[in-house]
């Protein structure tokens, strides 16, 4: 956990590492964390919005609409078939008391806090030897953004425009900085210098 008023920057996971982690967590019967990481990586939702999801919102559906906690804006999301299947599998193993229950409930019966999720993610990072420096809830949203950008590398400006809208950023420059692209571009400048 970071100190209050200190700045830490979450890093993204390489997509293949994120997908492997989702599978490993499910194999190890850690279905709640597998589902959390899958939802974060496939939807790009903020952790506050993931924690507010109920089973009835995401189970047996292709699309669902939320009101974002941070912005108050309504947002419709689509779940691809693989994610839908993973949700159903996790639901079957977790066996919530009712489908109106929140999806990420602790053993005490309360919704996980963001702080607790971050502690768990740090434990997961260590246990599964993830190659990421700062791994937190926000890493999932950044992983989503990086994958969307990487999949559209031949038309990166269009990808950035889409991500800017999805993330509700006010400019492409903010989205680039958010994804760490601006820093990479700056550092690449040094590579072009020759002696």
Could you describe each region identified by the protein language model?
Residues 19, 82-132:
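Active-site/catalytic core of tyrosine-dependent DNA strand-transfer enzymes
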Residues 2, 13-43, 154-155:
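Basic, Lys/Arg- and aromatic-enriched nucleic-acid-binding interface segment
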Residues 36, 44, 48-53, 163:
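Alpha-helix N-cap/helix-start motif at helix boundaries, enriched for small hydrophobics
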Residues 1-19, 73-81:
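DNA breakage-rejoining catalytic core of tyrosine-based enzymes
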Residues 131-151:
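Short basic/aromatic active-site micro-motif
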């Amino acid at each position: 956990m970071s100190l209050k008023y200190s700045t830490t920057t979450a890093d993204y996971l390489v997509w293949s590492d994120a997908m492997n982690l989702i599978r490993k967590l499910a194999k190890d019967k850690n279905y709640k964390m597998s589902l959390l990481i899958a939802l974060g990586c496939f939807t790009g939702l903020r952790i506050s919005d993931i924690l507010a999801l109920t089973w009835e919102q995401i189970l047996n559906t292709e699309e669902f609409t939320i009101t974002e906690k941070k912005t108050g804006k309504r947002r419709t999301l689509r779940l691809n078939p693989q994610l839908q299947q993973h949700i159903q599998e996790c639901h079957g193993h977790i066996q919530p008391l009712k489908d109106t229950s929140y999806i990420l409930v602790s053993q005490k019966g309360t919704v996980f806090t963001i702080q607790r999720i971050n502690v768990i993610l740090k434990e997961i990072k260590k246990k599964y030897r993830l190659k990421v420096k700062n791994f937190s809830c926000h890493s999932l949203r950044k992983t989503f953004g990086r994958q969307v950008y990487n999949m559209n590398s031949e038309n990166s400006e269009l990808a950035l425009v889409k991500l800017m809208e999805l993330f509700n950023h006010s400019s492409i420059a903010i989205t680039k900085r958010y994804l760490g692209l601006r820093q990479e571009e700056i550092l690449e400048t040094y590579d072009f210098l020759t002696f």
